[in-house]
């Protein structure tokens, strides 16, 4: 069993990240979510066909090839069915999302929470800033009209820059889970070691995207940039101030990861309009959420609320910020 040691925490505090090799078992811990996503893909393909967005169901293809093909033909629309959150804008009562039991159980995985506890303590809240990223080979995205960081390269950013300012003092921990192998060729994570020491950096509008996102200007990142290659079950822990991005997927297979966030109970999440939950509480164990159906309903309620009242902007900086010129 992998445990987080004092030396690991020291490395995290010094470098802004730590890689826990083999924290999760690829079959025991990740097998259920891989199985769940086969069903998610089947249902999504049926719905996309019914909506007239795709013509072919690609049933003859294996999972990896099929998901890549559908992402391409749907112009990225499939990603909404795969992600464990709602999009930043254009939410309606039919906006797809995934809130399945395997995803919920992974967020509550005891090995994961044992590790998280070493970083932020035993009163653990599941922050709703969370994503499933199934990134196809880059050539499948060559003709898409939308640039989505969940399926394309992820720009340089800090997770502290993707939420509202009320969470500036929240002790948010990012937990990045490798479902497949992640290496340089297929678009692994890149980090700027020690960049967390600089605090919150300027983020500017990314002109390459017609979907709302912001990135850190090149001049602020520095020369020290490190690729982190991982195997299935490896987990990367990141400070909310650590600058990071991902490389393009130049392989012929998907690169699949999840990034989750946790913070101490009672601290703002930075996305108050999305629902989090108590994942662990040693002081009040009865307050823990352990029913995936309740989690799913909380997201469905949020979707209905956001259909009537759109969410606040996710962006911390104005597009015409003079420092971005």
Regions found by a protein language model. Give the residues of each.
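Non-heme Fe(II)-dependent double-stranded beta-helix
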Residues: 1-14, 21-156
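Short, solvent-exposed loop/turn segments at secondary-structure junctions
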Residues: 24-27, 132-134, 161, 181-184, ...
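Non-heme Fe(II)/2-oxoglutarate
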Residues: 43-46, 51-54, 188, 202-206, ...
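Short, surface-exposed loop/helix-turn segments at secondary-structure junctions
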Residues: 76-79, 147-156, 209-221, 273-278
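Active-site rim elements
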Residues: 90, 99-105, 162-164, 216-226, ...
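A short beta-loop-beta micro-motif enriched in histidine and acidic residues
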Residues: 121, 150, 160-172, 223-224, ...
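Double-stranded beta-helix
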Residues: 137, 169-172, 180-243
């Amino acid at each position: 069993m992998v445990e987080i040691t004092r030396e690991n925490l020291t490395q995290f505090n010094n470098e802004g990240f730590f890689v826990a090799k083999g924290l999760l078992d690829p079959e025991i811990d990740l097998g259920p979510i891989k199985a769940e996503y086969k069903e998610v893909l089947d249902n999504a393909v049926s719905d996309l066909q019914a909506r007239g967005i795709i013509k072919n169901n690609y049933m003859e293809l294996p999972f990896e090839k099929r998901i890549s093909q559908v992402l391409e033909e749907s112009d990225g629309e499939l990603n909404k069915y795969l992600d464990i959150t709602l999009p930043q804008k254009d939410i309606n009562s039919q906006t797809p999302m995934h809130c399945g039991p395997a995803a919920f159980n992974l967020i509550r995985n005891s090995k994961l929470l044992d590790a998280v506890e070493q970083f932020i303590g035993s009163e653990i809240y599941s922050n709703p800033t969370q994503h499933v990223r199934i990134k196809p080979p880059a050539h499948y995205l060559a003709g898409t009209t939308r640039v989505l960081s969940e399926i394309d390269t992820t720009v340089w950013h800090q997770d502290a820059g993707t939420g509202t300012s009320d969470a500036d003092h929240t002790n948010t921990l990012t937990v990045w889970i490798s479902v497949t192998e992640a290496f340089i060729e297929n678009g692994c994570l890149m980090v700027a070691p020690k960049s967390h020491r600089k605090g919150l950096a300027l983020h500017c509008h990314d002109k390459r995207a017609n979907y709302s996102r912001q990135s850190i200007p090149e001049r602020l990142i520095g020369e020290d940039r490190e690729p982190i290659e991982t195997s299935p079950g490896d987990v990367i822990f990141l400070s909310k101030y650590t600058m990071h991005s991902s490389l393009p997927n130049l392989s012929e297979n998907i690169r699949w990861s999840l990034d989750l966030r946790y913070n101490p109970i009672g601290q703002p999440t930075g996305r108050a309009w999305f629902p989090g939950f108590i994942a662990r509480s040693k002081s009040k164990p009865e307050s823990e959420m352990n029913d995936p159906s309740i989690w799913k309903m909380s997201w469905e309620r949020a979707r209905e609320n956001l259909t009537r009242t759109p969410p606040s902007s996710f962006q911390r900086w104005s597009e015409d910020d003079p420092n971005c010129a």
